[in-house]
């Protein structure tokens, strides 16, 4: 990884499911997050003012986990395509190399569409580490993306390229450490079923307008880092590239 990628949240293959403390069924009340939808169910034309571009339809990444990690991925459901092949979705937000992605339409537009979809209700909170209610964002994501675009989605698929992490507190985005003394609080969730969003703003993060883009999603023990700066082509503060 690049020298700037100091945060060890970037290490691949780190995801924790603790069945005793965080049962995988904990997503049952969080917008029907696990599993797939019929790829043709509920699809409708998306044209005219206020509609999202249908070119986003195939912003997908098809990767299958290694056998040694298969037990960690038993909540990822395979969606059957018309050709009978099964897709594994572990990322829906990334600009990837051609061999790693299937992208129809503009990558920037599609990526930013999803990123805004997930974070728009949060972006006005730019001071400290906030605990933000995710119900609106998650339900909106499920409705617009799953039902209208017909994408296979499970809670946590917006995480970065399968780089799973077992951090349950907000981290300092440039050093991978807890917030310094005197900084904003980083409370743990008490009720995992509430599906909260821990959002850390880091003044040291110059990309994306000074926004630290790490997050922790608590449901079924899923934790993740949204970004992969190693192939971020446009660190220009507008959420394009690598997000």
Swiss-Prot record:
Protein name per UniProt: Toxin CcTX-1
Organism classification: Eukaryota, Metazoa, Cnidaria, Scyphozoa, Semaeostomeae
Entry GO CC: extracellular region; membrane; nematocyst; other organism cell membrane
Assigned protein family: Belongs to the jellyfish toxin family.
Keyword list, A-Z: Cytolysis, Disulfide bond, Hemolysis, Ion transport, Membrane, Nematocyst, Secreted, Target cell membrane, Target membrane, Toxin, Transmembrane, Transport
General function of this protein: Has potent hemolytic activity. Is lethal to crayfish. Causes cutaneous inflammation in humans. May act as a pore-forming toxin, disrupting normal transmembrane ion concentration gradients in susceptible cells.
Subcellular location: Secreted; Nematocyst; Target cell membrane
Tissue: Nematocytes.
Gene Ontology MF term list: toxin activity
Extent of Basic and acidic residues compositional bias: 1-25
Spans annotated as Disordered: 1-48
Predominant subcellular localization, coarse grouping: secreted
Taxonomy, superkingdom: Eukaryota
Record GO biological process: killing of cells of another organism; monoatomic ion transport
Mod. after translation: Contains disulfide bonds.
């Amino acid at each position: 990884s690049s020298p700037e990628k100091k945060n060890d949240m970037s290490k691949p293959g780190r995801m924790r499911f603790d069945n005793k403390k965080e049962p995988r069924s904990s997503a049952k009340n969080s917008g029907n997050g696990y599993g797939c939808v019929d790829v043709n169910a509920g699809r409708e034309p998306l044209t005219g003012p206020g509609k999202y571009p249908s070119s986003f339809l195939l912003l997908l990444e098809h990767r299958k986990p290694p056998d040694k990690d298969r037990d960690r991925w038993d909540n990822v459901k395979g969606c059957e395509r018309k050709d009978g092949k099964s897709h594994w979705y572990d990322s829906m937000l990334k600009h990837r190399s051609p061999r790693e992605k299937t992208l129809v339409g503009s990558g920037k537009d599609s990526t930013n569409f999803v990123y805004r979809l997930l974070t728009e209700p949060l972006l006005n909170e730019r001071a400290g580490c906030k605990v933000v209610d995710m119900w609106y964002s998650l339900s909106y994501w499920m409705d617009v993306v799953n039902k209208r675009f017909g994408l296979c989605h499970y809670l946590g698929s917006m995480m970065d390229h399968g780089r799973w992490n077992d951090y349950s507190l907000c981290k300092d985005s440039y050093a991978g450490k807890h917030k310094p003394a005197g900084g904003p609080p980083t409370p743990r969730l008490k009720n995992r079923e509430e599906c909260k969003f821990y959002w850390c703003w880091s003044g040291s993060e110059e990309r994306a307008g000074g926004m630290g883009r790490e997050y922790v999603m608590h449901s079924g023990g899923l934790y993740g880092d949204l970004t992969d700066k190693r192939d971020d082509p446009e660190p220009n503060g507008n959420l394009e590239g690598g997000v």
